[in-house]
Amino acid sequence: MDLKIGDEAPNFDANTTVGKINFHDWLGDDWGVLMSHPADFTPVCTTEIGRVANLKEDFSKRTGKVRVLSVGTKPGLTPLESHTEWIKDVNETQGASVDFPLIEDPDKEIANSYGMIHPNASDTLTVRSVFIIGPDKKVKLVISYPASTGRNFVEILRVIDSLQLTAEYQVATPVDWKHGEDCIVVPAVPTEDIPGKFPKGHTIVKDYLRTTPQPNI
């Protein structure tokens, strides 16, 4: 399945390293990040999982819940045994304390429902997919990285900031925007309505390019 922005995130029941979950129930009214990694006990994936664990507070203050899925597990172990043993390595080598769930998907049902397996890359392992999902259970962002390239989680946090801001206010965020910087007033807002909606002030660069200080700080 090729999920697109605005599609409903497929729901699923799954076993994880912290017990069984229903994905939509777990999300509740929060934002969620669902990621896939190619395989346990691999170098790039190990650094990624450690990085996410060390950014726990940054995700938490954005009410961003994290779930990680893997279909590549260690031979001789069940998927959950593989995940659990690998977490020990992640904690040891990355100075981390992984406490978010890793999902087992032995039949690749979840991976296929999210389009995480790209046959031109590998027909058995997932690519490095990222799905940001809103409280309405709709997909807000989709990114796919090749197996050779680790993800930039600072960028993922930046996108969550932008998505949460623009879900509440009639603004967009410009190139390289970071939390605390000026935003763009969306074209749907008439210029004469800007002072009432954005009392912090605004700047008219062009009639189609109006900026305002970030409204929620």
Question: What spans do the regions from the language model cover?
Answer:
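Chalcogenol-based redox active-site neighborhoods
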Residues: 1-217
